[in-house]
């Protein structure tokens, strides 16, 4: 899997480098709406029986190096561990801005960084869990199979992104993005941890930090050419 990711990143860098050596006469600046799919979620849904998800994204280039974007999606995730079995399903939405970092403003290939805010509404079911009796050397642990249903949960977080998009065909782009996330607010019921937040990823008790990545395919619908 790591080798596959490295190959994708290398491919994108090579294409961006080639695109950046074009002269101003080789291409026109295109301003329009770019719509895309997260291929990572599609592949995970096909290969991981404990996961299902999809998302649609879109961005608009407002200035030479400034983009606004949004993403909407849904995820279902089953978490299995030695002490817990839980399932989560819900929807999410993100809004943010991206700033183009590469110097040649005319090339459609971009390296960018950005900042976004995310919101998710979801339900969580605790199907079974293990408790430990620290006061008894005879009973040790007990598995509880009484489900706990937690509905209408939500969370808000921020993301810092770094990524790249390269034009592989006319107006068709392949992209890769890394994300560093931090939960700033979330709703808990009965003081039970939200073990997975759709759109955010896995959570941990000790920190609100998280990480993620995506690789996307998108199509640019030009509105203005300069």
Positions of PLM-derived features:
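Short glycine/proline- and aromatic-enriched beta-strand/turn motifs that initiate or cap beta-hairpins
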Residues: 16-61, 71, 218-226
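Short loop/turn motifs that connect adjacent beta-strands in outer-membrane beta-barrel proteins
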Residues: 21-31, 65, 102-110, 168-174, ...
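Residues that define the transmembrane beta-barrel architecture of outer-membrane proteins
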Residues: 31, 50-54, 87-93, 109, ...
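Transmembrane beta-strands of outer-membrane beta-barrel proteins
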Residues: 33-37, 68-70, 93, 109-115, ...
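Transmembrane beta-strands of outer-membrane beta-barrel pores
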Residues: 39-43, 72-78, 99-101, 117-123, ...
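Extracellular/periplasm-exposed beta-strand and loop segments of Gram-negative cell-envelope proteins
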Residues: 45, 73, 77-88, 122-133, ...
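Glycine- and aromatic-enriched membrane insertion/assembly motifs of diderm outer-membrane
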Residues: 46-101, 118-120
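Outer-membrane beta-barrel "beta-signal"
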Residues: 98, 207-226
């Amino acid at each position: 899997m790591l080798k596959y990711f490295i190959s994708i990143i290398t491919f994108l860098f090579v294409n961006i480098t080639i695109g950046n050596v074009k002269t101003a006469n080789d291409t026109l600046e295109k301003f329009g709406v770019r719509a895309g799919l997260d291929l990572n979620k599609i592949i995970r849904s096909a290969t991981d029986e404990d996961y299902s998800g999809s998302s649609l994204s879109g961005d608009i280039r407002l200035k030479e190096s400034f983009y606004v974007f949004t993403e909407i999606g849904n995820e279902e995730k089953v978490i299995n561990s030695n002490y817990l079995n839980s399932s989560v399903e819900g929807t999410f939405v993100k809004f943010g801005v991206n700033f183009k970092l590469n110097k040649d403003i005319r090339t459609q290939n971009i390296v960018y960084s950005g900042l976004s805010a995310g919101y998710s509404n979801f339900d969580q079911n605790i199907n079974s869990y293990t408790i430990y009796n620290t006061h008894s050397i005879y009973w040790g642990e007990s598995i509880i199979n009484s489900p706990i249903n937690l509905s209408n949960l939500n969370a808000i977080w921020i993301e810092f992104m770094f990524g790249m998009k390269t034009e592989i065909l006319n107006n068709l782009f392949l992209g890769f993005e890394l994300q560093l996330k931090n939960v700033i607010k979330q709703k808990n019921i009965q003081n039970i941890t939200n073990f997975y937040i759709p759109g955010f990823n896995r959570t941990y008790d000790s920190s609100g930090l998280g990480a993620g990545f995506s690789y996307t395919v998108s199509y640019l619908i030009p509105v203005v050419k300069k």
